[in-house]
């Protein structure tokens, strides 16, 4: 599956860039996120408070078991397991953003803070997430 974000002509990620991006994927990136408006009810259970997603700036990490958005729920991390992701696609909600659709109908959008080769890095992250998701589906099917 290919994604064309129409990157600048002739600008490519070098081997050094790819190594740096791979390292940053694990460490985490500061990103503008649109996440479901989760909150806690009186019993302490997680509930969706409204249908609209809220915009926030968080650290996004992509680990072996899923995507983590740090402190998305007060002090708790939001973890999106590979098995819960139904589709990854580019979006116009946030400039150079990626939309992660889940099987339960919710979605998360994020765009990393980086002005240097942003479209190529977003393309790399898109491919990385898709590979992880597909490998996870193949492993459990």
Residue ranges and their predicted role:
Residues 16, 36, 40-44, 50, ...:
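Intrinsic disorder/low-complexity signal
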Residues 26, 34-36, 49, 60-63, ...:
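A structural detector for beta-sheet-dominated domains
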Residues 1-60:
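Anionic N-terminal interaction surfaces
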Residues 3-6, 10-11, 20, 76-141:
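Acidic, Ser/Thr- and proline-rich intrinsically disordered linker/docking segments
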Residues 49-97:
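Phosphoinositide-binding peripheral membrane targeting modules
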Residues 33, 41-43, 70, 110, ...:
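Short acidic, gly/pro-rich beta-turn/loop elements at beta-sheet edges
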């Amino acid at each position: 599956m290919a994604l064309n974000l129409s990157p600048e002509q002739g600008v490519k990620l070098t081997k050094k860039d790819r190594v740096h991006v791979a390292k940053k994927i694990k460490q985490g990136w500061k990103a503008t996120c649109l996440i479901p408006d989760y909150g806690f009810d009186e019993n302490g259970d997680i509930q969706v408070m409204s249908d609209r997603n809220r915009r926030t700036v968080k650290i996004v990490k992509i680990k072996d078991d899923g995507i983590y958005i740090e402190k998305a729920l007060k002090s708790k991390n939001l973890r999106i397991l590979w098995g819960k992701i139904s589709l990854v696609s580019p979006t116009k909600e946030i400039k150079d953003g990626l939309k992660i659709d889940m099987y339960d109908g919710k979605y998360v959008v994020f765009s990393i803070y980086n002005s240097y080769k942003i479209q190529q890095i977003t393309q790399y992250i898109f491919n990385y997430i898709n590979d992880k998701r597909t490998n996870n589906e193949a492993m459990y099917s």
